[in-house]
UniProtKB/Swiss-Prot annotation:
This is UPF0102 protein SYO3AOP1_0546. PANTHER family: UPF0102 PROTEIN YRAN. It comes from Sulfurihydrogenibium sp. (strain YO3AOP1). InterPro entries: Restrct_endonuc-II-like (IPR011335), tRNA_endonuc-like_dom_sf (IPR011856), UPF0102_YraN-like (IPR003509). GO terms for molecular function: nucleic acid binding. Belongs to the UPF0102 family. HAMAP family: UPF0102.
Amino acid sequence: MDKTQKGKFFEDKAVRYLESIGYKVLHKNYRSKYGEIDIIAETDNVIVFVEVKGRFTENFGSGEESITKKKIDKIVKTALQFIEENNLQGKDFRFDVVALKGNQIFHLENAFSLE
């Protein structure tokens, strides 16, 4: 499985998980000039920007450990563009991480903020 296939595998698994707990998936792999957001969803009237990290093993550390400050900056800028493009100013939003390790799913709500 190459990197693209692995990414799709973990993102599809994360989508199924989020939908199973009541999230409505609005967009997958949203791209802007700043970067990409894996999943954009909505729950309880909150827009949730989700970064998906997956590992089959922990040989190279956990998925959530691989989210750098630079990556967070790209996600935030991309999210702000999505909000503007879709006239969502004034809506509540947050940034989550869904980390998958083998068959385990870890959902970290409010993993980071705009600051």
